[in-house]
Amino acid sequence: MDGPDEQFMRRALELAHRGRQEGEVPVGAVVVVDGHVIGEGWNRPIAAHDPTAHAEIQALRAAAAALGNYRLTGAMLYVTLEPCDMCLGAMFHARIARVVYGATDPKKQVLKSQVKIEGGVLAAECGELLSEFFAAKR
């Protein structure tokens, strides 16, 4: 008999199959709180014309809408493929407590060398704007 991790991963796999039927890369994800699925998603970048429409993002958006809050503190996310950095960043901001994935993504390390990242341009002005914003909020 399957435990909870296997049960939720099986649901994510069902969603991945749905993505495959739609011609998308077959990845599915579910967000779980207190043993209940509150958000589901499958890859939709092609259909949505949206490079951020990964299964994890779709599931996070659905879960946030269900709770009326982008903070999903204590939630768990199950996904059929190891999350990319964008999705991990979204999970961090959503305060996901635990991520369980199925297959390892062999392209994950390759992608890190594809984008040149530079920082520090107008750093003082950018930092000042953020400091002023958060000072006014507190």
What spans do the regions from the language model cover?
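A short, polar/charged loop-to-alpha-helix boundary motif
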Residues: 47-57
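A short, polar/acidic, helix/strand-boundary loop motif
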Residues: 2, 45-46
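Short, basic and Ser/Thr-rich N-terminal targeting/leader segments
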Residues: 23-27, 73
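Short beta->alpha transition motifs characteristic of CBS
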Residues: 38-45, 114-115
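Zinc-dependent deaminase
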Residues: 1-22, 86-138
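Small-residue (primarily alanine) positions within well-ordered alpha-helices
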Residues: 12, 16-19, 29, 55, ...
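Short beta-strand scaffold segments in enzyme catalytic cores
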Residues: 27-35
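Immediate flanking context of iron-sulfur cluster ligation sites
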Residues: 69-81
